[in-house]
Design a protein with these regions (language model features):
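A short glycine/serine-rich beta->alpha loop
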Residues: 6-16
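Short hydrophobic-aromatic micro-motifs
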Residues: 10-11, 20-21, 76-77
Length: 187
């Protein structure tokens, strides 16, 4: 028999290593004489901000639906992926989520607010032909070069299962290169 592997990896909590991971491999070996998946991504645990296991009984658990309602799903995801590598335990702190919302998403929002009025004034519609690189100002060539380097490096991080490094590279690009340099010098 031939087994169809739909995904090349499985991601589960570190507490599932002996149970779920092993069971899937044992079944696949017995039934299909093959492995169940090619790679394992073992997620760490989400702990409270002091490094303790979250528990309703202790009152230190965070309601995920309440957190999504309060902060939004994108800031929560971004905080969790850029705060620590997925295989490490994450000390969850709502102050960190607020900081991500302000520093990363606020910067993205403000960058767009800088761009939008000028684009609207010029009648920009995303349908225009590309401006040849040689006809662009030096600052535009610089940010596009930085963007292309970012894309290459983020792709390499993802290929190496390093989403935290990828997220931090994006963070640095948005906060440093795009906002602090490009937007400020273009004003």
């Amino acid at each position: 028999r031939q087994m169809c592997i739909r995904d090349s990896f499985i991601a589960e909590g570190v507490d599932q290593t002996r149970g779920w991971f092993f069971t899937l491999h044992a079944i696949a070996t017995m039934v299909f004489d093959s492995v169940a998946y090619k790679n394992v991504i073992s997620n760490g645990l989400v702990l409270d901000k002091n490094g303790n296991k979250m528990s309703k009984r202790l009152g230190n658990a965070v309601d995920p639906f309440g957190a999504i309602e309060q902060y939004g799903s994108d800031p929560l995801r971004w905080y969790m992926i850029t705060n620590s590598s997925p295989w490490d335990n994450l000390k969850f702190d709502t102050d960190g989520v607020m900081e991500v919302t302000r520093k990363f998403f606020g910067t993205l929002h403000n960058t767009y607010k800088f761009f939008a009025p000028y684009a609207n004034l010029d009648g920009f519609t995303y349908q225009e032909a590309d401006v040849p690189m040689s006809k662009r100002p030096e600052i535009d060539r610089w940010i596009l070069s930085e963007l292309n380097s970012l894309i290459k490096n983020v792709d390499m991080c993802y290929a190496d299962y390093e989403p935290t490094k990828a997220g931090r590279l994006i963070n640095d690009f948005v906060n440093d290169n795009l906002s602090n340099w490009y937007v400020r010098l273009c004003r």
